[in-house]
Every structure is written in structure tokens, then in C-alpha cells.
């Protein structure tokens, strides 16, 4: 899994970069 360690706000996985997913409970992208 490649997920840049950049705090990006998100509402959906498609808002995130590469293999990141949207962690909806915190509203930021991360690794599942």
C-alpha cells in the first residue's frame, strides 16, 4: 500500500491519493 503521509480532508475514497482511503470517522485520508 502506498499512501502519501499528507493530511487530506475527504468525504470519499476518490478524494484521496493512490492507495489511500477516506477514514470517514475522522474525515481524513489514510491507510485502511
Curated annotation (Swiss-Prot):
- State the superkingdom: Eukaryota
Output the SUPFAM superfamilies linked to this UniProt entry.
Answer: Plant inhibitors of proteinases and amylases (SSF57027)
Q: Does the keyword Transmembrane apply?
A: no
Localization (cell): Secreted
Keyword Iron-sulfur on entry: no
Q: Which GO terms describe its cellular component?
A: extracellular region
Domain statement: The presence of a 'disulfide through disulfide knot' structurally defines this protein as a knottin.
A single Gene Ontology MF term assigned here is: serine-type endopeptidase inhibitor activity
Which keywords does this chain's UniProt record carry? Disulfide bond, Knottin, Protease inhibitor, Secreted, Serine protease inhibitor
Q: Which cysteines are joined by disulfide bonds?
A: 3-20, 10-22, 16-29
Its name, as the record gives it, is Trypsin inhibitor 2b
Entry similarity comment? Belongs to the protease inhibitor I7 (squash-type serine protease inhibitor) family.
Identify the residue position(s) of the site Reactive bond.
5-6
What is the protein's known function? Inhibits trypsin.
| SMART domains linked to this entry | PTI
